[in-house]
Structures are given as C-alpha cells and as structure tokens.
C-alpha cells in the first residue's frame, strides 16, 4: 500500500480489526521507509445498484450522497460520526436486502428519514425540510406535529 506521506510502496500492517458492524476491515499500517502510520479500510465490493430519480433518470447508488446529506442536517447537533455511519450502514443494508438492482430515490429518502427520526429530531426536521421541498409553513408545522406526537408517545411508553 502506498504511503500517503512519502509515496513509498511498501508498508506493514500494525493492527487489523473489524469495523462498521463487521462489514469492513480497518487496518493500521506503517510505511517501511518513513515510519508514517496511516489507516486503510477493506470493504466488500457490492454489485452496482441504480437509483431511479424523480425525473426517471438513473444513476449509480452513492452512500456518499446519503452521508453528505446527513452530515449537513446534523451540523451542530449531538450526533457522532459513529452514529451517522451506523445509520448509513442500516440504510444501505436494508436497500441491498430488499432491492436487487434498482431502487427509487424516494424510497432511499424515506429510509433516511426513518433512521433520522430515531436518531435526532432536529436532524430529521432539517433533512426533511430539504428532502420534502416544503411549499409553505403549514407543511412544516404538520411535520412538527407528527414529531411531537411520536416524542410524547415514546415518553409515555417508557414511564
């Protein structure tokens, strides 16, 4: 593996462990020339999955698009990068188990919203406000009422 610091092609594995709920192997490596330590990840290459967009066009599934959307929605919220990564893993696992080669962007958006509703209500509202393209304040108010009902039912169920 090429060292990102000096470009030398030989490195040794210092530590290796499972990551991302067992779907990835994380390796700590050390460059044999300069001693720089760096991390690499080994992940199973999945078959290509196409996303059918709202306009009917198709593009390859990108977990990075989901990641970026969630990160943007979770800014300045108490949501860890591990929480986000686990959220994306659950979404991707569900998509790959239920859809063979194509899935609609609407389905993906709904799965993201379901995960965010459990993770953090504010992050959920931020994501929904972009994803749902609200036309007026009444639509946002309706969403907030749904969240409020869910939060209250959770609190009353845990008492």
Curated annotation (Swiss-Prot):
The keyword Membrane does not apply. Binds 1 zinc ion. GO terms for biological process: negative regulation of DNA-templated transcription. Keywords: ATP-binding, DNA-binding, Metal-binding, Nucleotide-binding, Repressor, Transcription, Transcription regulation, Zinc, Zinc-finger. It comes from the Bacteria. Its cofactor is Zn(2+). Residues 49-139 form the ATP-cone domain. The keyword Transcription regulation applies. PROSITE patterns: ATP_CONE. Pfam families: ATP-cone, Zn_ribbon_NrdR. A zinc finger (unnamed) spans 3-34. Negatively regulates transcription of bacterial ribonucleotide reductase nrd genes and operons by binding to NrdR-boxes. Belongs to the NrdR family. This is Transcriptional repressor NrdR. The gene is nrdR.
